[in-house]
Amino acid sequence: MSNSPLLAALSRRVLVIDGAMGTSLQSCPDCHLDDWLGRENCSEILTKSRPDMIQRIHESFLEAGSDCVETNTFGANLLVGAEFDDEVVAMTRELNREGVELAKAACEKFATPSRPRFVLGSMGPGTKLVSLGQTDWDLMFQSYAEQARGLLDGGTDAFLIETCQDLLQVRCAVNACLKALDERGMGPEQVPIMVSITIEATGTMLLGSDIASAVNALRMLPIASLGLNCATGPVEMTTHVDFLCRHWDRFVSVIPNAGLPVLVDGQASYPLQPKPFAKAMRRFVEEYGVNIIGGCCGTTPEHIAALVELAGDRPPPERTPEPLPAGCSSLYGFTEFQQDNSFLIVAERTNANGSRKFKRLLDAEDWDALVSMGREELRGGSHLLDVCVDFVGRDGAVDMDQIASRYATSLNAPIMIDSTEAATIEAGLKRLGGKCVVNSINLEDGEKRLNEICPLLKAHGAACVALTIDEDPQAGMAKTAERKLEIAARIHDLFTGKWGLNEQDLLFDPLTFTIATGMEDDRRLGHETLEGIRLISERFPECGIILGLSNISFGLRPVTRAVLNSVFLHHARERGLTGAIVHASKILPRTKIDEEKWLAAEWLIFDRRGEDRPEGMDADFDPLLYFIGLFPEGEDAVEKVSLESLPLHERLQRHIIDGEDDGLPETLDEALAEMSPLDIINKHLLEGMKVVGVLFGDGRMQLPFVLQSAEVMKKAVARLEPLMEKVEGDTGRGSIVLATVSGDVHDIGKNLVDIILTNNGYTVHNIGIKQSLQQIVDALKTTNASSIGMSGLLVKSVTVMEQNLKSLNDLGITVPVILGGAALTRFHAEKRL
């Protein structure tokens, strides 16, 4: 339970934070160059040289009605001080203490029993970004910890880690504050930690993180509030504030600039005046449910007075946020554990124990080639990379530091850190700014492994894989469904109870064993794993379940393994499997597996022998031998269909459905002799894509094969597009901004619309995939287009479109909007949008 007066006040009403210290300093008539003591731009030194001026600025905002003032300590940390001189570094703790004392002295003049005033210890981002390798975690941690100690020395009411541009920097600063608090026997319940990130006009943080990535990466850290400040004015923050209020379950703050800066006589000037500023903020308080408002660059006491009038004694707004689904994130994007119509594909080849190529490149320290290998895995359809650098003779922590630092900025997928060594795991977590998954914990040595890893999970907000292994000397690796559930339940209780971690961040691995040995004890291991998945998913529906899939077929030939892996995956998903660590090439869609081989794989998995043997089989029927016998030496696992023998219209569709580009040019040339390019697309190729959509929706085709179909579709359209009749010149028919909405990477349908509209005389501005509403609005203003088109394949994209429409209305944008995508129905569009 919190005993923070600040949090108590926030539970009663909306609070107002002060305005810009920098703007106030620039306007001070008695601020002279000598006041900086030869350290120009080191504003913190003014706490020493001109305490009267700093306190006067605090008092000007308090007189305007501000509830909270920020200390003049934005850059008062070791790393920033080192850019000036050793004396500033030595004064770090003192500057922070005195900064708090000045602010407290000002607050005491205005505080009343019914209206207390609060000091927020300002902690800025510094000048070096840890994700870019400009400094490292340990140096940044020391820098922030010393600053936090000074702020606590002065008696700050809260830490405000603000203007954050790097999620890894946020996590480092939060942990430094926790360290300083722990040294005093205190916690964030007494001195809350507040975080404010900066979303640029591009719609992301400086390093490319969107608001969803930020919420996901920070939600498990013990921070009291999350908000936005700087970079833009309130209007440009609208969509991000809306998202934050809908998905963040604690206090929300909004501290914008006084509009976007303009140059006046060579100086940045902020044009938004106090009344329009407050008017733009009204929606955030009244509709969205923001708890804390204030001003950043360009805001004056007059701006704050306008906000105070807006807030009044308004009680805390009612908000019912919907937490983001369970998932993880890279710096650049959020990935749900539960994928739409698919499973979470975790690449297995970025692993020194599973890939000879990865091990060879790691041994050669060919870091660029290792990055390229990671990219290859993602191009194959993987959502995450399982990264393991453990092998004899190398320092795992050093190798993980090298690889993780490169993967963090070069790849857009989250990382699963796979190691038996806590030091290696920690090295990865200190380099990866998103929310990682740690692989793994177990009970092999009792609670020892959890005691090592769970503190790292808490400190870094990471999710975790848990293997169903315990300390039983005879049956430690759970092989029966009941044992798998028993161990899972024990881990769950420790994870959520003793360690206070969220069960949504727990993914159980109920263990996969080969069923291809022919040994009696191994025959039913596949069935037991499937039953274990069912029991665990029913008992712990909020947890994920993941498998090292290819273990099931270990010992078989590659062609045979692909079929068994695919059939086993199908049944595992039916019972609740969330994801699998597997190479995408080792999975086949059901449509490409001969029915006899599919059934034979099922007989092997479910051990259909003896009285349970399939009808018509002999009493000594052995499903393993039968299954192996279906794959003569040199035979392919995939059922081959001769496209040449099919009628033309069916052949066109099969090229798309099978993702087969061999012979595609010849098929298209034949079709062009009979029909127009547009008819080929609309009547045949799109019909093939519809089938792909149905198979994907039913779970009978996995994402990598959908992507293959998409590539063939792109090639076909690229060949047909130059042959389409095109209306030349400006027809006056209008123009449109086309975009795939935020969080969605699918663009086939959107690009087809682009081609068709362009060829019919419309002007199309196709701005690409994963476009935020701000990017769409910016494109609309830049192009002066007459309409907007939003596209998305995923179910969640419909929700994004719905929110975008609401925000467009809020922004007063009334141009026609066209929506499209596989998950969108006419009924939903007419009734909900």
Regions from the PLM with identified roles:
Residues 1-833:
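Domain-level signal for soluble alpha/beta catalytic cores
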